[in-house]
From Swiss-Prot:
GO terms for molecular function: G protein-coupled receptor activity. InterPro entries: GPCR_Rhodpsn, GPCR_Rhodpsn_7TM, Orphan_GPCR1. Glycans are attached at residue 44. It holds the Pfam family 7tm_1. The gene is Gpr142. Orphan receptor. It is found in: Cell membrane. This is Probable G-protein coupled receptor 142. Keywords: Cell membrane, G-protein coupled receptor, Glycoprotein, Membrane, Receptor, Transducer, Transmembrane, Transmembrane helix. Residues 1-66, 124-140, 207-224, 286-304 are extracellular.
Amino acid sequence: MHLNSNPNSYICDAYQHADLLWSLSPHVLTKAVQPQVTLLPTVNGSNPRYDGVDGHWPESPERSPCVAGIIPVIYYSVLLSLGLPVALARLAARTRKPSYHYLLALTASDIVTQVIIVFVGFLLQGAVLARQVPQAVVRTANILEFAANHASVWIAVLFTVDRYNALCRPLRHRATSSPGRTHRAIAAVIGVTLLTGIPFYWWLDVWRDADPPSTMDKLLKWAHCLIVYFIPCNVFLVTNSAIILRLRKRGQRGLRPLVSKSTAILLGVTSLFALLWAPRIIVMLYHLYVAPVHRDWRVHLALDIANMLAMLNTEVNFGLYCFISKTFRATVRQVICDVHMACALKSQPKQTVVELMLKSVGTEL
């Protein structure tokens, strides 16, 4: 487990827990203040020989370079600054439809993913602080990150099953569907995903671990691939195929297919999920059995890009919602107008602000 002293790859060796925290270059951030020495990396593994280690690590010429440079810093900063406000805007919408609660729960899990992984883990600890953190904090963050990812995926699975029942078993769906039942199902999924995140306390960092993967490493990585991709994709494939088949049968009978907005959103969300997460799963298994990330710069770059695509999944859902649903577009428009109004009020004198507020109240009345 070695570290490169090249300043352009320093942040590559910063804290990247759950291997969803990707490489970046701090050349423009820390060159003036950081001496060009080989720093002790944050320990993120279950190997006891790293506990209590202090000092500098020897350089390793085999360390794969960080070829992505400063691009991930800009990418994830834009991703967070754009994705978090619009995700909060989605939560401002109100409805009594059970299917809509699944969308709101999916939004909430996306917010948690963005805050923990992108801001706390990647930008704050890696790009801003550029320092080590206690091992217990790193491992606890692993639990939260994996739990947030698993919750986001499995809430989408719940949403898929709900749409399947609504189209293929409409009478049963109307009799059993209710906001209370939906809330209990979402709460159960969140509780189970928190439990599934606990074993990832011992997740090893693929960016720095030079030792061959142990049995625990293989079990955790395969468990992650099964929980977050293979099992959900099989559910999506079966249910979406049944939904599309039912819609085609309605069209052949001369009836209108009646593709609701929720169903259209569902098909888009699941398709994008399968496409955007596939590269990450492929590269992870390639790293596990063929070439490690820490030695081959091509695998290093491939995992960078794959992780960026996987994180993009939390953002493209919003564009899909707005493209299909008038409710989302109206909500976002209203939130933007409210923010603009608040900024305008702050820039006006006190008397003018009172007049504007009175006019607004008079208009509503």
